[in-house]
Amino acid sequence: MQSLIQLEDITHLDRHPVEKSDELHVEWFIGKRCNYDCSYCHDLNHDNHSPHTDMTHIVNSIGKMFDRFQNKLQINFTGGEPTVHPEFGRLVDFLAECDINVSMTTNGTRKAEYYTDIYRAFNHITYSQHFEHAINDVFLPKMKYINEHRGERSMQIQVMYHAQHEDAVHEAIRYYEFHDIPYTVRRLRPTKNHKYPIQEAMHYSPEQLDNIKWFQASDTGHVPNVRVTAADQTHTVHTNELTGLGMRSFKGWMCLAGVNFIRVHDNLVYRCWGEFRTPIGDITDPDFQLLTEARPCIANKCVCAPEISTRKWRV
C-alpha cells in the first residue's frame, strides 16, 4: 500500500463496499461491566460495579431505528463485556426476530455452545483474545469449535499483541493459521487506567514492532473496508493500512459522523469517541434526531475502523 498511496495525497475516505456508504452504523456500548480487568483497557470502558443499562431502553431504541432505516441499519455491540448483562438473552431474542445487520465484540469467555446459539441474532462476532486472562489451552479449542459450527455467520479473532505474553501470542497465531480461523493482530496503545498507571503490555521491543507489522500484513481477517481517494485515484484497503501510515487524525476535515455513524454510551449519543464530551442527544428521547449534514471534525483521532471509514473529506 505504501507504494500506491502517499499520506499527504489522501483527500477523501468512504466505506467499502459502496452500498455501505448510506447505512447508519451504530457503535453501541452496552455497559462498563466486565469479567476481565485488563491493564491496557481504558477506565471509561470497564469496571465490575457499574449499573447495567436498562435493556428496555435498548430494545425500544433499536426498534425505532429499525422502523426508520430497515436494512440500512448496522449495529455493533461493545462493552465492557456485553454478555455479562443479565438481560442479554432478551436482546438476543429480540434481534433474532429482526432483519438487522448486527455484530458484537466479546472476550469469548462463555462456552462455545453459547456463541454458536446466539449466532441466530448476530451476523458477525469478533472475539478479542486478551492474554492476561485468556489461556490458550482453553481459548484456542473453543475458537476452533465455533469456527466449525458457525454456519454462514462470520467470526474474527482479534489477537491483542501483549508484549509480556509474546510466546502465547505466537502460539495462538500459528493455531489460527493451521486451522484456517480468521484473525487480525492488534497493537496495544497506551490508555488511561488508574489501576495500572505503568502499562507494560505495550512496551514493545523493535523486533516485536516488526513482528506486529508482519502479522498485520499477513493475517487472514483483513477485508477491504474503506475507499481511499488519493491523487485522483481510488483504492480499496483495510483501515489498519491507513493507521499503519499514521493516519488516525482527521481534525478539521468535514465528516458525516452524527449523520450515518453514531456512538451510544449510557444512552447518550455521540458523533464519535473523540467528541465524548459533547453528546448530540439521548437515544431514549422520543424527539432525538440524527444530524442532517456533515460537520468539521474536532476530535484528535479516530479510534476504530467504523469511525475511520465514515465518509469524510479534506477541506
Question: Locations of the language-model features?
Answer:
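Conserved alpha-helical substructure of the radical SAM core
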Residues: Q2-T105, T109-Y114
